């Protein structure tokens, strides 16, 4: 598989950047010019070039604010929502340099230099789409969800985050373990899920830096005025991020971190034990369940696990990368519709209105089965071995939803 993202200036066609992941060859300037030329030719004839199919893949063009055109190319059978990927990349560009600067394009060379700061996040984002990168620490799933860990310590950590944020006169704090969201401050829900994902990505790409500050523009709340995001490494693979003003200085923040978090070292270590299972041990899963994706539709958070059982149990012969790929493909192509709210607009019949009453969907193949069911704000997508009867599969999914929704150790 391979995925490629190209950014060009809409009017001049000057390449801004190109980033790729996978086994595709490096993109040549002539190829970039040809791809952009196709889009410009269509515009000259009042046509909209949406996407096109190529051998074992597709290409998508998206123009933003008449200043930048993003081109996405996915090949090798990768199930990737290119439109969502390009939208995320555009938000990342705003996140890095601000909407006003991106829309004006006064100095392309300067913009190209400024956008280099977003390359680590962009590369991280592209690598996270690769199901073969099972040894990578990057969370691997879908672009419209915030991958999380559910652990009993979340409420204690939320109180600590509130205290830490208040000490810095900041807002919107979160704690991540292995790049997955574990706990947030009380006001974190004010952020648009797209902004929350970008902040989590920023924390996940710190490369071990103990303390770092980064100017960020929140695409929905403040696209033109920068905030200051301060990221601190507490333990190995454990980071806290808070959005605050110009003060206090980093040297003072170092002291505040010690004061606020010194007493929570054991709590954080206990929370780390939940990884890579990502669910409390009080929740048990049937041996025939090979993997699970749990989605909270209220806050766009999800929990994914392919390590549901003890390590001494048999793995049923399915590689971990294959489980990831199956569950993601199942969610993107079928189960995602269960997570959406379909509302008719202005009395007109929505084209997806017939899905309003649907609460489950099933996939059956020769080697595995997938079943998804929604109950309230929770959507459970489960991967089963092919020998499990369909009626048993439905009963198990329903029981998992009930166990998860009533478990008192789960705090979103």
Describe the predicted segments one by one.
Residues 1-412:
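Intrinsically disordered, Ser/Thr-rich regulatory regions of eukaryotic membrane-trafficking proteins
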């Amino acid at each position: 598989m391979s995925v490629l993202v190209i950014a060009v200036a809409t009017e001049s066609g000057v390449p801004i950047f190109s980033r790729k992941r996978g086994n595709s060859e490096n993109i040549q300037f002539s190829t970039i010019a040809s791809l952009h030329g196709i889009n410009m030719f269509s515009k000259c004839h009042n046509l909209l070039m949406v996407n096109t199919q190529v051998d074992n893949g597709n290409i998508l063009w998206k123009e933003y604010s008449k200043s930048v055109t993003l081109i996405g190319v996915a090949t090798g059978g990768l199930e990737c929502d290119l439109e969502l990927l390009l939208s995320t990349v555009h938000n990342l560009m705003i996140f890095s340099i601000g909407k006003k600067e991106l829309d004006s394009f006064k100095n392309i060379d300067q913009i190209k230099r400024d956008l280099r700061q977003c390359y680590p996040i962009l590369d991280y984002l592209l690598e996270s789409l690769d199901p073969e990168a099972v040894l990578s620490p990057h969370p691997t799933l879908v672009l419209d969800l915030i991958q999380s860990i559910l652990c009993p310590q979340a409420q204690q950590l939320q109180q600590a985050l509130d205290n830490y944020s208040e000490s810095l006169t900041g807002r919107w704090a979160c704690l991540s373990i292995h790049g997955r969201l574990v706990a947030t401050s009380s006001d974190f829900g004010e952020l648009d899920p797209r902004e929350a994902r970008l902040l989590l990505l920023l924390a996940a790409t710190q490369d071990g830096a103990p303390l770092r500050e980064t100017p960020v523009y929140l695409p929905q709340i403040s696209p033109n005025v920068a905030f200051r995001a301060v990221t601190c490494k507490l333990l190995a693979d454990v980071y806290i991020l808070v959005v605050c003003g110009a003060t206090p200085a980093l040297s003072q923040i170092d002291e505040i971190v010690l004061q606020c978090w010194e007493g929570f070292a054991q709590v954080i270590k206990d929370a780390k034990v939940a990884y890579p299972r990502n669910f409390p041990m009080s929740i048990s899963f049937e041996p025939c369940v090979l993997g699970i994706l749990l989605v909270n539709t209220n806050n766009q958070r999800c929990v994914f696990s392919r390590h549901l059982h003890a390590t001494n149990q048999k793995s049923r012969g399915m590689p971990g990368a294959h489980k990831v790929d199956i569950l993601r493909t199942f969610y993107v192509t079928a189960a995602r519709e269960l997570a959406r709210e379909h509302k008719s607009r202005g009395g007109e019949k929505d084209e997806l209105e017939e899905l309003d009453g649907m609460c489950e969907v099933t996939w059956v193949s020769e080697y595995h089965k997938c079943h998804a069911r929604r109950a309230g704000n929770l959507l459970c997508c489960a991967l089963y071995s092919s020998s499990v009867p369909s009626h048993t599969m439905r009963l198990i999914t329903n029981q998992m939803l009930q166990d998860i929704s009533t478990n008192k150790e789960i705090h979103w």
